[in-house]
Structures are given as structure tokens and as C-alpha cells.
Amino acid sequence: MSLLAAEHALQSAQRAGDVDALDALLHPRCVGVGPDGSVFSKDDDLESHRSGALRITRLEEESLDVREDAVSGVTRLVAAVEAIQGGSAVSARLVYTRLWARTDERWLVLAATLAPAAEPASPDVGGTP
């Protein structure tokens, strides 16, 4: 599977809350940092989906940059996200930066950060009045 295909499989698993698919795509020692600075493990992430504490209702890809070499890769996704988190509806435009490791011919997320994305520039910025 290509890194692009692995990233799209991860997004699909997130949208579906598919814990088995997420488990297969996350490295056992995966660590993440959320938009609030909180640090979470693979087990924390899987449990949030399994328990329903996090339910992603929309994850719409706006842009995706994929870079890879033989054993590692990085994906940078900007996405519009809507979710139910801890019983409350939340929406945000986020940047997901993921470090992937290739093991046994498959890609696994080793580390991830989620951060608020800058608003896109207005088309008329810098234009003449």
C-alpha cells in the first residue's frame, strides 16, 4: 500500500470510527499531541473511538501533502472536522501532521500532531480596490 493510500485509509477509519482499522494503521508506540497540547497514546486514541467519547462526523480533506522515502514518510493534511467529543459538538479546521514508519511493507503512524489551521487567504488579499 502506498503512503497516500495508507493516509486515505486512516481518514476513512477515523470517519467510520473503525477501531480495528485504526489499530492496524497505528504503530504500537504511536504518540499524538492534540490541538490543546494534550498528549495521547495509541491506546488512548483507540479507546476514545471505542467508547464513543470521540465520534468524528465529518473529516473533509482540503489539502494533503505526502512525502516518503524507503522507510519513513510524512503526511500533512488540512481538513474541516466536525465531531462529538465528550458529548459536545465541536468543529474546527485542523492540520494533521503525521510521521509514518514502513514496517513489513505497510505504513504505520508513529507520531501525530493536530493543530488549528490558519484560515485560507481571501482571494482579494493584495488586490487593488
PLM segments and residue spans:
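ATP/adenylate-binding site constellation spanning eukaryotic-like Ser/Thr protein kinases
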Residues: 27
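A beta-strand edge to alpha-helix "cap/lid" segment located at domain peripheries
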Residues: 1-23, 31-129
